[in-house]
Amino acid sequence: MRMNFSTMATAGLLLAALVTTTPRARAFDGNEDGEDDNKSYAIGLWGDLPYSAGQAIGVKNLIADMNAQRLAFTAHDGDLKAGSTVCLDTVYTDALGYFNSLKAPAAFTPGDNDWTDCDRTAGYSSLAQLDHERLLFFNTSYTLGQKKLRQDVQATPLCLGFGGTSVPCVENRRWTYGKVTYVTLNIQGSCNNLCDTLPDAAEFAARNAANIAWMKLAFSEAKKNRSSAVMIISQGNPGFDATDSTRGPVRNATTLAEANAATDGFKEFLLALRAEVAAFAKPVSYVHGDSHYFRVDKPFLNATGQRLENFTRVETFGDNQQNGNNDVNWVKVFVDPNSREVFAYQPQIVPANRTAVPLP
């Protein structure tokens, strides 16, 4: 439980840290050693891990597998634990250890299990936990990892912290690597904090507005910089159509209306995203976790029912223990700024984690 500090002090600490902290590892902007912006590279995506002690062992194997490959950076799309377990300090310190054991820069965006759902345990505050994550994982303008990557930060105090005071949305990041713009957004499962144990409409409204503004700015910067593509990384599955029922909201694909409008924490964002995707006209990849179901598809339609061909949804592997398969694996993305689609996706089944079908 972390309710013994003022949110205003937290905001000040965050802003001061972003200005004054020097990363311990070497940092760089975009491409390493002056590499050509047009050069192809690969990144690693993972999330919704670990949910158990067994998966924690699998995560170490996953990290070793990532470290054995040449990656420009990695990104974890949130959920460091199961939603039903207590938000103990060790959850976050263990995660920090995982991220900093990665050789490549390690980007991260929080998950609902990390903060939104923490109030399922008496005495725990969702916003106190989010404040703790902001201080632990986002106290500089760089990624985590043994090598650091410089990021732009949404430092304007648009979000809410513990006590309801406005604080910087420092978890929202943006960076450019090889002519591609990347952006993280604090978008959550549990109806984006509008359902579950203690819904918080005020917190949602502030963060939702901040997310939309940060997303729009990312597309504006991508256009200004003539980026070849945009990749958005968040936790929650917003639901894109009537078939997306695997823990995601089911909605009308053209109106984007959800059946239960009272707890729809995504429609306003999706409407804004759809407009930006159409206007950008170049490849857009939307990476999320939440549903624990690896997939790459094109579920986004415009208001007249036409598919937005330049939009691809990527859901990373995640906890799948209920089906007897832990799915402690990751997704390798090949990025070629000069190719037509820019992104190519390849699931990586970690050899040391194979149990159902062991290696021959």
Task: Enumerate the language-model features and the residues they cover.
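Bacterial N-terminal signal peptides that target proteins for export
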Residues: 1-10
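Bacterial N-terminal signal peptides
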Residues: 11-18
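C-terminal segment of classical bacterial N-terminal signal peptides
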Residues: 18-24
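N-terminal active-site segment of His-dependent metallophosphoesterases
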Residues: 26-91
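His/acidic metal-ligating clusters that form di-metal
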Residues: 36, 66-73, 176, 183, ...
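Active-site glycine-centered loops adjacent to acidic/histidine catalytic or metal-binding residues
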Residues: 48, 78-79, 111-112, 235, ...
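Extended active-site neighborhood of metal-dependent phosphoesterases/phosphodiesterases
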Residues: 86, 90-210, 214, 293-296, ...
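A short C-terminal boundary segment appended to hydrolase-like catalytic domains
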Residues: 331-360
